[in-house]
Amino acid sequence: MIQKGSIKARLMIGIAAVIVVAAACSSAPGASTAPGGSGAASGAKYTIGFSNPGGVGNGWREAMLCSAKAQAVKAGNVTKVTIIHRDTDAPGQLSDIRTLIAQGVNAIIINPAGPDALNPAIAEAIAAGITVIAVDASVTAPGAYNLSNDQEQYAYLGASWLFKAMGDKGAVVYMRGIAGHPADTDRDTGFQRALKEHPGITIAATTVTKWDPATATQQINDVISAGTKFDGIWTSGVDSNIVDALKAAGHPYVPIVGADNAGFVTQLLAADGPKGAAVTNPASIGGAGVTLALQILSGQKPAATTVHVTPELWSNTDDAGKAKLTAAADPSLPKTWPLGLTIDGWTTYTKAELIACKGPGDA
């Protein structure tokens, strides 16, 4: 866990917490590979809302929000950012979005609890002239923009590697994220596609981790205690704690797939670590969402309403993968934080600014 005084403590985002950060002034971001350029409009000032319904205590979600705060500071034309971050469901997020609408923000960034359930509130926001951007996963509401990792490909890459590492036979523990979350749904599509291509693979157990490390640890312990035989583990980003649980239980390591989280990458590079692969899933998509919002607000709309970041797979079973893992490794980060701290063309803050996790006006 992240200790008091660390990034998590500085983020100050507890259940039902609402964080308001005030004005900042610095240079506007360049966005050479992002659609439409920097997004800065001369003299224009904007307010941004961010709704994140879940993942309180999850390192990826913490990094996403820190990224948004850091990019808002760098933009120089954001007067306030309001973040509503709590563990809730789609109806709860509908309420949160409407709270942001009532505050009169210019743009709302959401990590959506569902692809369709938020459409009524999104439609209300768009009718009020508010730009709406979904990050991490997509929504279907007309007029909204989607900016995320390609989650289907994320799962397909990892599952395909895993099944080959298992010798195209055996049983896998399938550890999913949050039921109904569009990213989880897309990942399941990718996982099932890979599964069909490897008929020798069966599923030993399926769990829904809610992307919570403690929940995932209990689930793998339950699988082990039940005597369920398995030959591989696919995790939806809760990974280092699963390796720790195998070790604590005295269970032999099996091939495992996770995300590019700091702790997991360190484990993959260890001489006595498991055979495994990390698939990239940058939480800096939060900061990229700020950049896209500012571009749209300044009249620089992208050609498409959905933009995907392409994931990569880094395995410790080949030289190229080991080189990627070694280059990305960063033991200074909390183990649950992803290593994709920035996205070229979309974010302009430094690592130190991200880790400080301070938005405009924060002391």
Give residue ranges: language-model regions.
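An alpha-beta-alpha
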Residues: 50-57, 61-70, 156-201, 205-206, ...
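Flexible loop/hinge segments that line or gate small-molecule binding clefts
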Residues: 115-153, 171, 262-270, 274-275
